[in-house]
């Protein structure tokens, strides 16, 4: 036998299909359960590409019924809820109280997903700016509110909403995740 042994076995490739489906369903449910408009386009794109990768990895490593999966779903919901425009002073005060923990949890998720530093920094900066604009709504005259023109009302008949859901379902949804 030679010093280099060969085998007919191909290297094992991890199959993430079930994890991708679970992550897509969790993300879809989290978006659907969030009251208010759909997130801005840059948030949706980040959620489809990078955040879903985080959910896939947590699901793959820990499983559907795990505490880690429950935490991943929780931080997803909190992130989405934190960017919903509100005129309620109570809701804004709650956001101020919850932001430090949310930002810490988002950074942990980004690290787990091994998101590129430039993408991470860009997302966190845009998220900070969005949170600041949401918190300033109370101080602005009603005719000078924050421009939320790139958000989409949560209406299942809206083709933009359907397009988002289509990206979260099926093969088209998998093209956004690089494993």
Show where each model-derived region lies.
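Extended, low-complexity, amphipathic alpha-helical coiled-coil/linker regions that act as scaffolds
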Residues: 1-179
